[in-house]
UniProtKB/Swiss-Prot annotation:
GO terms for cellular component: cytosol; protein phosphatase type 2A complex. Belongs to the phosphatase 2A regulatory subunit B family. This is Serine/threonine protein phosphatase 2A 55 kDa regulatory subunit B alpha isoform. Residues 14-25, 172-189 have a biased composition (Low complexity). It comes from Oryza sativa subsp. japonica (Rice). Keywords: Repeat, WD repeat. PP2A consists of a common heteromeric enzyme, composed of a catalytic subunit (subunits C), a constant regulatory subunit (subunit A), and a variety of regulatory subunits such as subunits B (the R2/B/PR55/B55, R3/B''/PR72/PR130/PR59 and R5/B'/B56 families).
Length: 581
């Protein structure tokens, strides 16, 4: 499935902002803007507490959760109806697919509050570091959220609103009286049943009593209405188990346990037990001066409940089996790339630190993100990554500046598509990159988190050399000077896209730019454009028969609709050839 030759990382980096490229037979993804939540106006200041710090889809893709630096968790739910027809069948027939996942705001709740550790004289901020969905039951939503020290297990349920009915007084009889009017009414003679002594209508500014009063007293009745409210309830609090900041949580496929990781330890928890955890990984040396690496991320295998992986600041990924021993000091496999001789520098170890890892949906591959690259690892091949994708190679000459402003320590996340054919990660300037993983693919797309994801390319166009084939396929190259913006200024390294998530079943990405949540969807470019490019290229070569045969043999099998379109485009190609001749 994956590219064994290293993924053509250099060629991937050559594709600029808003561009994509692919070889024949490998359809590219056409990305479009879908939705935005919390979009800020031009010149509007962003509050620190509103910046999004975590994004996560649930396994079905029907719900999305975000956490922010203010300790809040916001839930979104999918609103569009799902098609009953097979998506793969529709793509095979080139049927137009206009639907894309649409979400709406569902609920929010305060997950964490700022705290103070009096024993260590340490402030614990409320920022949400990670969110993970748990298996649900009874139409409820369950998730884990964590800050630096405390993990909480939340259950969100729909509750019907209860109302009080059958009141003793008609709501229309209630006035707007005051205490003075009430005292006035008490001075007048009333019967024990509330009636007037003179058997006449008694009216004050509070209550209108009927003549003779009320014959009986009716108790209020509580009834459930059709209105539904979402109620978030904290079921468990898992605290006092980590001496260092928690950087990861991951739920197990057994639905009963999860892990939490800090810089030196990984703990195993049972969801139903909050006062006990088991330390399964401990990399703390007897003497802290001998410490050479720390844990940066940990993730459970998606299907094997006994397997998990964790990454380190030295760029290695260790796979451990919980069945080996209670304390997993020894790993079953280690994945690391050996550095080339003579290439070591002061920044080598810093940029090699892995900030995030993700398993593919089938559990066969691991995607890792270090500061400069994305790497795809095959669990069956620990000699090196099967693909390496350069994310922002143009920043390598600026590592000194990045070190001075601490940007070199930014932790970018990564994600894989549900089918495992694409990977994505963020960069600076609110950009994120999407790469193709199919064998031989050179697909690379750079998008900006805005309503117009191609805005950077439109503002700063270039005119590289193009062939007629690349023109027909819509291949566009970005600016050569990718380290500057449209005005020629250096990128503002504070505008960075750290967090993003891929929909588990569809080609849709949610990403966070400061306090704004942007969502994009993609459609595969129809193969008829590849057919057109091949026909037009053959036309440019003066219709030589051997060239025709070679071009047409490289075209993938066509569906019924594609065949009709191919005939139409063949006519265009012939016309173009006549003009050339």
């Amino acid at each position: 499935m994956m590219n064994p030759d290293g993924g053509d990382g250099d060629r991937l980096e050559a594709a600029g902002a808003g561009s994509s490229s692919a070889q024949q037979g490998h359809p590219t993804m056409e990305w479009r803007f879908a939705q935005v939540f919390g979009e800020r106006a031009a010149g509007e200041d962003v509050q620190e507490v509103d910046i999004i710090s975590a994004i996560e889809f649930d396994k079905s893709g029907d719900h999305l959760a975000t956490g922010d630096r203010g300790g809040r968790v916001v839930l979104f739910e999918r609103t569009d109806a799902r098609d009953n027809a097979s998506r793969r069948e529709m793509e095979r027939q080139d049927a137009p697919i206009t639907r894309h996942p649409e979400f709406r705001y569902k609920s929010e709740f305060q997950s964490h509050e700022p705290e103070f550790d009096y024993l260590k004289s340490l402030e614990i901020e409320e920022k949400i570091n990670k969110i993970r969905w748990c298996q649900t039951a009874n139409n409820s939503l369950s998730l884990l959220s964590t800050n630096d020290k405390t993990i909480k297990y939340w259950k969100v349920q729909e509750k019907k609103v209860k109302q009080v009915s059958v009141m003793n007084l008609d709501s229309r009889s209630v006035g707007t009286g005051t205490s003075s009017s009430a005292s006035t009414s008490s001075s007048r003679g009333l019967l024990p049943n509330g009636g007037c002594s003179d058997k006449s209508s008694f009216l004050n500014s509070d209550i209108l009593f009927p003549p003779g009063g009320y014959p009986s007293l009716r108790l209020p009745v509580v009834v459930a209405s059709q209105d539904v409210n979402l109620v978030a309830r904290c079921r468990r609090v898992y605290a006092h188990a980590h001496d260092y900041h928690i950087n990861s949580i991951s739920t197990n496929s057994d639905g009963e346990t999860y892990i939490s990781a800090d810089d030196l330890r990984i703990n195993l928890w049972n969801l139903e037990i909050n006062n006990q955890s088991f330390n399964i990984v401990d990399v703390k040396p007897p003497n802290m001066e001998d410490l050479t690496e720390v844990i940066t991320c940990a993730e459970f295998h998606p299907t094997h409940c006994n397997t998990l992986a964790y990454s380190s600041s030295k760029g290695s990924i260790r796979l451990i089996d919980l069945r080996q021993s209670a304390l997993c000091d020894n790993h079953s496999k280690i994945f690391e790339e050996h550095e080339a001789p003579g290439s070591r520098s002061f920044f080598t170890e810093i940029i090699a630190s892995i900030s995030d890892i993700k398993f593919s949906r089938d559990g066969r591959y691991i995607l890792s993100r270090d500061y400069m690259t994305l790497k795809l690892w095959d669990l069956n091949m620990d000699s090196g990554p099967v693909s390496t994708f350069q994310v922002h190679e143009h920043l390598r000459p600026k590592l000194c500046d990045l070190y001075e402003n601490d940007s070199i320590f930014d932790k970018f996340e990564c994600c894989l598509s549900g089918d495992g054919l694409h990977v994505a990660t963020g960069s600076y300037g609110n950009l994120f990159r999407v790469f193709g993983c199919t064998p031989g693919s050179t697909e690379a797309t750079t998008l900006e988190a805005s309503r117009n994801p191609m805005r950077r390319q439109i503002v700063n166009p270039t005119r590289p050399t193009r062939t007629l084939t690349s023109l027909a396929r819509g291949v566009r190259r970005g600016g050569e000077n990718q380290g500057v913006d449209a005005n020629g200024n250096s990128f503002d390294f504070s505008t960075k896209l750290l967090h993003l998530a891929w929909h588990p079943t569809e080609n849709s990405i949610a990403c966070a730019a400061a306090n704004s949540l942007y969502m994009y969807y993609a459609r595969r470019c129809l193969r008829k454009f590849i057919v057109f490019g091949s026909l037009l290229e053959a036309a440019c070569l003066h219709m030589q028969p051997e060239i025709w045969c070679r071009m047409l043999s490289s075209i993938p099998p066509l569906g019924p609709k594609e065949a009709v379109d191919a005939h139409k485009m063949a006519f265009v190609a012939v016309t173009a050839s006549l003009l050339i001749l």
